[in-house]
Amino acid sequence: MARKKLRSAAVIHLGSENITMQLMEYTGLDDIRIITELRSRVRLGEETFQTRKISFGTMLQIVEILKGYRQVMREYGIKSYILQATTAVREAENRQYFLDQVLVKTGFQIEVVNMSREIYTKMASLLRTLETHGNMPLPREGVLLADISSGGLGLTYVKDREVKFQQNLHVGLVRLKE
């Protein structure tokens, strides 16, 4: 039997309160090993939800963090990455300027995902983990999953491995502080 090729990649999430990066090695979906994980605090959500913009100071902070993450990737010899931003960037009026600045200053291309995809990705990962590592098959009647994030609340009903219903509300933990 042929041995699967070991690959490496970085997954970076630019969220409302943190920027996280996981470096991993993998041969497939069932064989993923986290090499290291970094987390940096940013107050992006509070700012965007209050002013509808990302300030120049916050942009600089994020650029510096991402430059550091890029350096760590170089040290590990990792070139492949996925960098996704969610609610705080998605709702910023100056989103395109921010994305352009990050690309020019760090070389990172940011994918801004919509709320439905953001929640779907989290739920798919959770369900897969429960089934493969938690020995927890989905109940026959389905399952209702709640995702409470900084920027929103998502409810997803899954039955027979299909999303039957999804509702997203703009009531997250950071928004409730406003």
Can you name each region flagged by the protein language model?
Residues 82, 86, 90-92, 97-148, ...:
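Active-site neighborhood for divalent-cation/phosphate handling
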Residues 5-110:
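Conserved phosphate-binding loops in N-terminal lobes of ATP-dependent enzymes
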Residues 49, 163-178:
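Glycine-rich phosphate-binding loop plus the immediately following alpha-helix
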Residues 44, 117-119, 170-173:
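Residue-level detector of flexible, active-site-proximal loop/helix-junction positions
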Residues 40, 113, 169:
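Hydrophobic residues at beta-strand termini and immediately following loops
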Residues 2-33, 126, 132, 136-169:
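Gly/Thr-rich phosphate-binding beta-strand-loop-beta motif of the actin/hexokinase/Hsp70
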